Amino acid sequence: VTTVMETSDKVVYIYFTKNVSGISREASVDVRFTDGGAFSLHFCQHSYDDTIAIQRMWPELPTCPVDDNYIYNTHYGKLGIRSDARNYTYCFDIRNRASIWVAYPLHRDHMSGSGNRNNSDFGYDPDVEDNLQAALGLGSYNGWYDRGHQLPAADRKCSQQMMDQTFYSTNMTPQQYKFNQNKWGVLEGRVRNMTCNDTLYVVTGAYFGGQHHSSIDASTTDRKGNKCPTPTHYFKALLRTKSGNTGRRIDEITSANQLRAI
């Protein structure tokens, strides 16, 4: 651990070297200032793994393997008095022009507020190159396929900013319209019914490697003619505390008996 005091902005920067030891290591740092201020910091640094693209900063994230076809990203937005609350994290597969999973927290605070889907527009995710995404700002996928949200817009009424981010192409997959408007919508509602005083953590995923139902084409196109494969399966995985009223984060829970996975 090394520290550097930048006199220009009077900020103490703490730097860590890569941990190649094969085991986690910990360090405690006491910072004392001449004006009497003091802070104690404790760090736990996991061993570096060059097969993992990003370390899981949130407990519900799937493993994030390094793959040239995957783009990992997190969007942040306004939630209450916070301007930088996490909205969702995704793994975008450039081969399918879609995310294979979208992970997000869900609480009652996310589902009420000023966000209005009528004020949102479908469009490109600004953090991913346009040419890698489905062009959904021009309209839905061709054929009988809706622009199906992985993180539902109804789960982000907390602010217009968070609502708008759910309309990015990276949050969409081509869904057969009857499925999207019926069974998928029912499932989304059931997930919302699982919310509690503690945070519910959700991972929604699309799987492209199975056998298509006879009513589903192997692929469709967007309005620019780009090929967009259709998922063969979808899933939702949920994690929360059993009581729903612990007032603790998932990573603060010490016993698996206190958790509920669905």
Each model region followed by its residue ranges:
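Surface-exposed binding patches on compact interaction domains or structured appendages
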Residues: 1-13
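Extracellular ectodomain segments of secreted/surface proteins
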Residues: 2-4, 42, 48
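Hydrophobic beta-strand core residues of beta-sandwich domains
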Residues: 4-6, 21, 229
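Generic recognition of long tandem-repeat/solenoid scaffolds
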Residues: 11-16, 83
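Well-ordered beta-strand positions in beta-sheet-rich domains
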Residues: 11-13, 28, 38-42
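Surface-exposed, short loops/turns at beta-strand junctions within beta-sandwich domains
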Residues: 17-24
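Surface-exposed loop/turn motifs at beta-strand-loop junctions within extracellular Ig-like
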Residues: 18, 33-37
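Domain-level detector for secreted/extracellular nuclease and nuclease-toxin modules, and
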Residues: 24-33, 44-262
